[in-house]
Amino acid sequence: MGKRNYLIEGVSGTGKTSVAEELQRRGYHVLHGDRELKYRGDPKTGEPVNEPVHESERDKTVWQQEHLLWDIDKVKSVIADHSKAISFLCGGSRNFSKFIDLLDGVFVLNVDDIETIYRRLDERVARDPTDFGGKPEEKELVARVHRTKEDIPSSGIIIDATQPLLSVVDEILSHVRAQNGSEPSSPNLAQTGNT
């Protein structure tokens, strides 16, 4: 993955995928954890599990959230590969505690207003009706996680994700630069003029 590896986390609708895509556009190495690493597993053991039959849509939504894990062996493998200067893992994982200490930093995207999150979820589901966040039970779960901050790293740098996307990414890169004492290296940095 990279010599320096960072996790970008946050509640659904805070902009993790948008940030990941903008970082990629700027030439950074990005791993979309929710696409490339996720599986349904036992939150305690990590063993893959089959989804049971649920009594209600709410039970199904909660179960899926609680059992959304990232493959730890894959995460460790990517972190051990130092062929990139900087890499970002973006997405939500219920087992981040199993690998968070291997990372150089964590950024937590935050949106204070739940209505903004609902609007973003509605926009996302309008583009892809199968995406998470369109059902009332999913919005209820998002509201709970937003309120309690459960399943969100508590040790990360909070990034105000109500800013325009480019400002959010600039702020993340500013923190990376400060931590490294230099400009984050990106193949497209000179072309885009972004720092």
Which residues make up each language-model segment?
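The Walker A (P-loop) glycine that initiates the GxxxxGKT/S ATP-binding motif of P-loop NTPases
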Residues: 10
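Conserved glycine(s) of the Walker
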Residues: 15
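Conserved phosphate-donor/acceptor-positioning beta-strand/loop module used by diverse small-molecule
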Residues: 102-124
